[in-house]
């Protein structure tokens, strides 16, 4: 018996069910976490700047040499050697004698006791002479002193010799009483019409001192004493070897003839003129103004052939009194009616007067300079400054190649 084999079954054409399509799962993204707020950045401190190098020490200054003192003008006692001569001249009352006295006080040893005693006699005579001039003015203007006692005193004063009188208590009391009189005060207000010196109130204020038996005049007294220059006086100066000799000559008409005695010893001129007395008459001639006399002398001097190439130093003196007179009076325009500037401006009036002098000296040239100074001769510093400047000019111009 055989065994029978099984027949394999044929594959079935039946379709298998499709595998289920897996569902697409959408991935929902997880929300991103919100960024945490970052702390604001703190400002970082600036790195420290490197220290600047210390500046190099400044070089030590070189030691400075002490400034050399300006060359000094000195007076010379022994004036016998040759020197550059200057003629110090001008009309009367121009102040050149005061200028010379200042030179003596500042550069030399001043005045000895004998000189001062002589000045005291002069000052006392000035007091008497002044009162006489005021009394004469009253008489000329028909003004009488009303007080009978004072009128009698006035006659006594008229009879006194100013240069040779005993300055006793009786005379002093009469002078004091008259000085306080209203008529005399009125006369003094018109002193510019007379030859009365400007300084007399200074002396009347100290008349009791001046009457003292042992009184010795001060330098201020000496500078104000009025003495008409007689003769010729010389003072010699030295500036670094440059010798300059100043010859002071009298300014009154009677003294001018003596100027010829020193002409062969001088090369230049210092000419003094009082600007303050432009409206005052000459002492010698009441009909001639002092300023016109000065202009005439200046013209004559500057046109001498000897001075055709010489320096001329024009010293315009008493500028303080001139300034007050110009500011407070109409005197300038009365004397110079042709003046078209401001007659109350001292500088404008002074410039006008200076031009009048320059016109007298025309023609001008570089070889003959005319150098002007406005000064107050009573001021010693101004006189010294002027004298120094004159000496320096002479030294530079005439001794520089010596």
Swiss-Prot record:
It comes from the Eukaryota. Mg(2+) binds at residues 97, 229. Disulfide bonds: none annotated. This is Guanine nucleotide-binding protein subunit alpha-1. Residues 82-402 form the G-alpha domain. Residues 23-33 have a biased composition (Basic and acidic residues). A lipid is attached at residue 3 (S-palmitoyl cysteine). Keywords: Cytoplasm, GTP-binding, Hydrolase, Lipoprotein, Magnesium, Membrane, Metal-binding, Myristate, Nucleotide-binding, Palmitate, Transducer. It is found in: Cytoplasm; Cytoplasm, Perinuclear region; Endomembrane system.
